[in-house]
């Protein structure tokens, strides 16, 4: 940072230094903030307004968590005003000991953003200590022969205060023999020396008592005293003399204990006992006496304890040499301790944010720390470094203060925490280092969406499953932590109707298990697709979708249903006519059945259960075709009955039965008298009356129902077909996945409008547009047959005369044996049949059979036996044609004729059928009817 920081002092006895120019938005200050306070300031006293000096408002004090930190915290910050307050007793002599300049270094830390400011509090000395002598009484022995002006060094007083409050001067009590002289020590201190002014005379006065007073420079001054007791002895007039007054020695702090550092030497010109010299410490501090030892006979000085430059840089000792005659002299020994690189750097964490958001950008401060090396010079210069492979770096904010900041993007899913090792190395030789490891936890952010184990799921569920059972399970994982990684599942879309989705499936929000809410029916619902969503609990939440396709497998739960032969409108069995001259291989009729199942479960086989003449007819195993085995014999009955069983290929197989009534006749006139003329019983009068009453009642009821039905249909239809009166079909399907109820509840629903012209002589009917929505809950095929028969039955009795004029069968109806349809498109008449190549072929075959059944009421096929019809009247059964699946038309045979559905398709397409007698066939059929 550029610029300079000036200082100002507070008014009053407390001197406080403030910065005149303080940068507000820099991470660190160019110079530390300085305050000056006297020692022994009362607790709670205000040092200065730290918030103001830092440029912070009162609101910022608590918002940015202004605080101070130090190794020993003597100060605190008022959270309301931002004042820096005295927290603990401040004793300058205890804190700074002998240092003349006493400063306390603090760090002011603020958050949001994290920053640090340096504070120096100068502790000013207060005159709270009086000078003090180590001994309250000083005993001296002075020979009477001592010459005038002889000086005797006295013990110095100690005053912990500094500057003006330190020791200022000495005073001696008034006397006529001695005066006091103050001399300066090399270290700047003062010591007193007692100077003889008058010759002593032991015989006159053998002892002298004086008072030595030490005064400091305080206001008011403080003092300390010591009693001096001087004993006058006989003359030993030559005191010992040191070779030099001051001895200086430089000593490395790493010298081991027991090392000799210096030998002092004193000589005495006296002889005898007065020349024997002993050495001793005189007025030496206890600390120095613990570190050094003195040989009292040789004057050799040894180390007793390890030296520590960081604790004491210099030792000053007074050595006294005394002869046996009690004469003494003193010298000074100054030991300079030379610093060695014996202290490793220290790392002190001042602030640490151990929780770091993983979306923190580079440059975010996560920790503040400082280094300290007690060595001096290059031994105390410290460099910091980080362990490798961590996305952090160190910024030096000021002298020995550092910031640990992010250097790269963080990813908790890859590394949830970092053990960052900070290494500090000094520049000594050899260098010393230390390290500190801090753990930084990365706080999770919802930055990962759930991921499904599969891109899509496919599950097969058999139909008629247990409701409530699980059918599938989806699983998604989220690498985030806690709520951000907690996944819940839900259904969000489906190809089913949304309002009925909950009645089909549900999903467990916790486990992802999909449950079936109902039993599925393959015939109604073969497949459906769900869209499931996995969502975590983060804010904002993240989600992922996956599709689940459910295939409903078929089970053999539907028995075959016989479409032909069907019962008549009055419940009587219909019959087929067979020419008497029918030859072996002649196609008599065909049993038509369907199975709503699929696959093997819908592969039908036909079996003869019972026959009037077992050897007269054969039944195709797969086709259901009834053919002549031999010609009709004279002994054979004209009326034949066959009981046919239709079985599917399921395990176990299901079956249905149908009864065929066959009449051998060359014309319809031979058959009708047997069915229309009944012998009258003897009591026919009463029976006739009963039947008449019942018939009249039924006719009245039917008439009323017909009128009501006609009115209702008129109201529901938006228009009336021009062809005549129409009846709405009940064969229709509902929208959605619900299957059709027609025939055997299969999957090929159709709905038609059934219209009959008003001309009873031309009972042709057509199918028009399909109806979209109408319920179908019963077997409508039989209803259609009954309706058709009820409409056409009156014409049978009315046209008996026309029947007698029936034209002979048209030879164009006949097909050769090779032209007759076989199974699966073959024309060789093989009854074994072939299995469809795939499921599509099977479904197409079922569609063909259902379509052929639906053609029972198709208006495009005339009742007169035109091309494409079965050649039967309304009384004898429904008409079967095929117009939806042309590939399978040849598999459906039209009983009573040699035509196939291909002819009917040609007629619908506007093409003339094979043969030129189409009109004659139609008129002939009308005459038969």
UniProtKB/Swiss-Prot annotation:
Gene3D superfamilies reported in the protein's UniProt record: Cadherins
Annotated signal sequence range: 1-30
GO molecular function, one term: calcium ion binding
Keywords linked to the UniProt accession: Calcium, Cell adhesion, Cell membrane, Glycoprotein, Membrane, Repeat, Signal, Transmembrane, Transmembrane helix
Tagged with keyword S-adenosyl-L-methionine: no
Topology relative to the membrane: Single-pass type I membrane protein
Subcellular location: Cell membrane
Listed SUPFAM superfamilies: Cadherin-like (SSF49313)
Compositional bias of kind Basic residues: 919-929
Record's function text: Potential calcium-dependent cell-adhesion protein. May be involved in the establishment and maintenance of specific neuronal connections in the brain.
PANTHER family cross-referenced by the UniProt entry: CADHERIN-87A, PROTOCADHERIN GAMMA-B7
UniProt name for this protein: Protocadherin gamma-B7
Gene name per UniProt: PCDHGB7
């Amino acid at each position: 940072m550029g610029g300079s920081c000036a200082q100002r002092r507070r008014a009053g006895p407390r001197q406080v230094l403030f910065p005149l120019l303080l940068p507000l938005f820099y991470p660190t200050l160019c110079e530390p903030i300085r305050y000056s306070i006297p020692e022994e300031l009362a607790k709670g006293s205000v040092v200065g307004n730290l918030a103001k000096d830092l440029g912070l408002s009162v609101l910022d004090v608590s918002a940015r968590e202004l605080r101070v930190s130090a190794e020993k915290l003597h100060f605190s910050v008022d959270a309301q005003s931002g004042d820096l307050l005295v927290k603990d007793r401040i004793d300058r002599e205890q804190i700074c000991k002998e240092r003349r300049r006493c400063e306390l270094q603090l760090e002011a830390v603020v958050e949001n953003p994290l920053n640090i400011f340096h504070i120096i509090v100068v502790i000013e000395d207060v005159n709270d200590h009086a000078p003090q002598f180590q001994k309250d009484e000083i005993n001296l022995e002075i020979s009477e022969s001592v010459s005038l002006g002889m000086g005797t060094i006295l013990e110095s007083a100690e005053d912990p205060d500094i500057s003006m409050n330190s020791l200022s001067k000495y005073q001696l009590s008034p006397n006529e023999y001695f005066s006091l002289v103050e001399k300066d020590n090399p270290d700047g201190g003062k010591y007193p020396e007692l100077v003889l002014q008058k010759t002593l005379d032991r015989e006159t006065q053998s002892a002298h008592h004086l008072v030595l007073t030490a005064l400091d420079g305080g206001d008011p001054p403080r003092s300390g005293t010591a009693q001096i007791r001087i004993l006058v002895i006989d003359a030993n007039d030559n005191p010992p003399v040191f070779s030099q007054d001051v001895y200086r020695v430089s000593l490395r702090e790493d010298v081991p204990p027991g090392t000799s550092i210096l030998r002092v030497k004193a000589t005495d010109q006296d002889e005898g006992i007065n020349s024997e010299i002993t050495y001793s410490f005189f007025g030496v501090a206890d600390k120095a006496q613990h570190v050094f030892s003195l040989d009292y006979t040789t004057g050799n000085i040894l180390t007793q304890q390890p030296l520590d430059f960081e604790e004491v840089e210099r030792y000053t000792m007074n050595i006294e040499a005394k002869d046996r005659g009690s004469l003494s002299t003193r010298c000074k020994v100054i030991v300079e301790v030379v610093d060695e690189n014996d202290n490793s750097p220290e790392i002190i964490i001042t602030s640490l944010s151990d929780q770091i958001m993983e979306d923190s950008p580079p440059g975010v401060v996560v920790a503040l720390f400082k280094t300290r090396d007690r060595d001096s010079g290059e031994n105390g210069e410290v460099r910091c470094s980080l362990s490798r492979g961590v996305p952090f770096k160190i910024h030096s904010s000021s002298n020995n203060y550092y910031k640990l900041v992010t250097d790269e993007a963080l990813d908790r899913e890859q590394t949830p925490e970092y053990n960052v090792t900070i290494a500090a190395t000094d520049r000594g030789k050899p260098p010393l280092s230390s390290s500190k490891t801090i753990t930084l936890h990365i706080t999770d952010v919802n930055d990962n969406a759930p991921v499904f184990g599969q891109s899509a799921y496919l599950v097969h569920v058999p139909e008629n499953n247990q409701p409530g059972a699980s059918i599938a399970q989806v699983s998604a994982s989220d690498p985030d932590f806690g709520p951000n990684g907690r996944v819940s599942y839900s259904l969000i879309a489906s190809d089913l109707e949304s309002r009925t989705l909950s009645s089909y499936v549900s999903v467990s929000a916790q486990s992802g298990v999909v449950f079936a809410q109902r039993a599925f029916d393959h015939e109604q619902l073969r497949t459906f697709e769900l869209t499931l969503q996995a969502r975590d609990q983060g804010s904002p939440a993240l989600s992922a979708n996956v599709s689940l396709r459910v295939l409903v497998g078929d089970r053999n739960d539907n028995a075959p249903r016989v479409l032909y032969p069907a019962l008549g409108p009055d419940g009587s069995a219909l019959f087929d006519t067979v020419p008497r001259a029918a030859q072996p291989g002649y196609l008599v009729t065909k049993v038509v059945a369907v199975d709503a199942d699929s696959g093997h479960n819908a592969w039908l086989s036909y079996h003869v259960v019972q026959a009037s003449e077992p050897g007269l007819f054969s039944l195709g195993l797969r086709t259901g075709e009834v053919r002549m085995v031999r010609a009709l014999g004279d002994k054979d009955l004209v009326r034949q009955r066959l009981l046919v069983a239709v079985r599917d290929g399921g395990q176990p197989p299901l079956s249905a039965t149908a009864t065929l009534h066959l009449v051998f006749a060359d014309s319809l006139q031979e058959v009708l008298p047997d069915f229309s003329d009944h012998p009258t019983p003897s009591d026919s009068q009463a029976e006739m009356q009963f039947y008449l009453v019942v018939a009249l009642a039924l006719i009245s009821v039917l008439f009323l129902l017909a009128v009501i039905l006609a009115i209702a249909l008129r109201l529901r239809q938006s228009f009336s077909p021009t062809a005549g009166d129409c009846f709405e079909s009940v064969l229709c399907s509902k929208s959605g996945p619900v299957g059709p109820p027609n025939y055997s509840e299969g999957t090929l629903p159709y709905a038609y409008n059934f219209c009959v012209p008003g001309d009873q002589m031309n009972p042709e009917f057509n199918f028009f547009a399909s109806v979209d929505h109408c319920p179908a809950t019963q077997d409508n095929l039989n209803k259609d047959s009954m309706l058709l028969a009820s409409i056409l039955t009156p014409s049978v009795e009315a046209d008996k005369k026309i029947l007698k004029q029936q034209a002979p069968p048209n030879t164009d109806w006949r097909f050769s044996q090779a032209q007759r349809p076989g199974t699966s498109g073959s024309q060789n008449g093989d009854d074994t049949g072939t299995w469809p190549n795939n499921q599509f072929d099977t479904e197409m075959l079922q569609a063909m059979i259902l379509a052929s059944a639906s053609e029972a009421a198709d208006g495009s096929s005339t009742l007169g036996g035109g091309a494409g019809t079965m050649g039967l009247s309304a009384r004898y059964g429904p008409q079967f044609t095929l117009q939806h699946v042309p590939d399978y038309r040849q598999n459906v045979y039209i009983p009573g004729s040699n035509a196939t559905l291909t002819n009917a398709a040609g007629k619908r397409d506007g093409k003339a059928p094979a043969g030129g007698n189409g009109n004659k066939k139609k008129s002939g059929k009308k005459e038969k009817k």
